[in-house]
Swiss-Prot record:
Recorded family membership: Belongs to the RuBisCO activase family.
Bias (Polar residues) ranges: 311-326
Keyword Transcription applies: no
Record-given protein name: Ribulose bisphosphate carboxylase/oxygenase activase
Keyword field: ATP-binding, Nucleotide-binding
GO MF, any single term: ATP binding
InterPro entries: ATPase_AAA_core (IPR003959), P-loop_NTPase (IPR027417), RCA-like (IPR044960), RuBisCO_activase_AAA_helical (IPR048571), RuBisCO_ssu_dom (IPR000894), RuBisCO_ssu_sf (IPR036385)
């Protein structure tokens, strides 16, 4: 099967890799090429095709390997794989690269709900150090005075803004945003269905029917066409015997005839796949289970009217109700923070964890409306009665905290 390589993707990758192996006087070449873009657009697969075309050997690291129960292991892994790749260049006498897939998933910080660990810091710092000193990469606990070969690093991800900003500066990382245009999509989808007898015009019609879908949608669509034959095969063998027939059988592997790859059938199946996508997008069940996502405007139905609470002659109830009444001073602080263009979040901690500073989010993050802030704080005071509750003002541009004010203490004072 002959797959399509987008010319501008191939050019970008080839230039970056080749430039790192050339000695150009007076030119500082970024060691890292960061390829980012929407999910499912074939960033990794296009890299694999380019490597194969150029005859380049690749050392792979997954974003999932960038975390470990032991502090320092991921940073050591990066250094070890880098040195191994440098040795490959020396021994094989050919271009080799180090590739890290989904870097943002392993070393990025998405929101306050994402844990920032020692390994996250060390991974960012290690990549920065390697980018600054690509021929002097040492393993912890040892030192080699001999310089090693320079190894280009290719990283992929969806959102590099979640990474440590100094890592992605231009001197260390060259960025390439991959968003295939219509011609690229037609070429790539044509490669996916190359053996299925679709004409160029039918490929274009298929792409134009689903213009907002990523590349992996069409790959999944081709796989789905075989579902009917596989279902019939399962029914023929029997659910009880299918495991033995497929995994542990002396019979020849099952063969399937070429299914119907007509344009009409592909569009029909594509609409079914699209329908499942929309069900996921519209369900938003995470709002019901994850406190961090509440109040972000994801509701699929209007919220119910608040019930009328009748007065109850109960001292504990009166005490809790009184705790939710915000003082004029607190309301004025909220207005001042928001008027400066900052956003607000609220955090809580019990008395035991207060000493260690282990604050946790009350729920909604980055509030920018006064009414939302007041209602969220009132709810937080009710939910965490008897704990410390504080208000945090955040500068969205600098992504830093500008105000931290304790609103409630365990003794009940606001």
């Amino acid at each position: 099967m002959s797959y399509y390589i987008a010319p501008r993707f191939l050019d970008k990758l080839a230039v970056h890799i080749t430039k790192n192996f050339l000695n150009i006087p007076g030119v500082r070449v970024p060691l890292i090429l960061g390829i980012h873009g929407r999910k499912g657009e074939g960033k990794t697969f296009q890299c694999e095709l380019a490597f194969e075309k150029m005859g380049i050997e690749v050392t792979l690291i997954s974003g999932g390997e960038l975390e470990s129960p032991d502090a320092g292991d991921p940073a050591r892994l990066i250094r070890l794989r880098y040195r191994e790749t440098a040795e490959l260049i020396k021994v094989r006498g050919k271009m080799c690269v180090l590739m890290i897939n989904d870097l943002d998933a392993g070393a990025g910080r998405f929101d306050e709900g994402t844990q920032y660990t020692v390994n996250t810091q060390l991974v960012n710092a290690t990549l920065m150090n390697i980018a600054d000193n690509p021929t002097d990469v040492q393993l912890p606990g040892s030192y080699d005075s001999n310089p090693i070969r320079r190894v280009p690093i290719i990283v992929t991800g969806n959102d590099f803004s979640t990474l440590y900003a100094p890592l992605i500066r231009d001197g260390r990382m060259e960025k390439f945003y991959w968003e295939p245009n219509r011609d690229d999509k037609v070429g790539i989808v044509g490669g996916i269905f190359a053996e299925d007898g679709l004409s160029q015009r039918e490929i274009e019609q298929l792409v134009d029917t689903f213009p907002k879908q990523s590349i992996d949608f069409f790959s999944a669509l081709r796989s789905r066409i075989y579902d009917i034959q596989i279902r019939d095969f399962i029914h023929k063998v029997g659910f009880e015997r299918i495991s033995l027939r497929v995994v542990n059988s002396l019979e020849a592997p099952p063969e399937f005839k070429k299914p119907d790859f007509s344009l009409a059938h592909l569009i029909e199946s594509g609409n079914l796949v699209l329908g499942e996508q929309q069900r996921v997008d519209n369900s938003q069940l995470v709002d019901e289970y994850n406190r961090l996502n509440r109040g972000r405007g994801y509701q699929t139905a209007p919220p119910p009217e608040a019930p009328v609470i009748q007065p109850v002659n109960n001292s504990s109830h009166k005490q809790k109700t009184s705790n939710t009444h915000l003082s004029l001073e607190t309301q004025e602080q909220i207005r001042q923070i928001l008027s400066q263009g900052h956003k607000i979040t609220f955090e809580h901690v019990d008395a035991r964890r207060f000493r260690t500073g282990s604050w946790q989010s009350c729920g909604t993050l980055h509030i920018d409306a006064e009414s939302d802030a007041i209602s969220t704080l009132e709810a937080c005071l009710v939910d965490y009665d008897g704990e410390y509750v504080r208000m945090v003002g955040i500068d969205p541009k600098g992504k830093r905290r500008v105000v931290e004010t304790i609103i409630q203490r365990p003794n009940g004072k606001n």
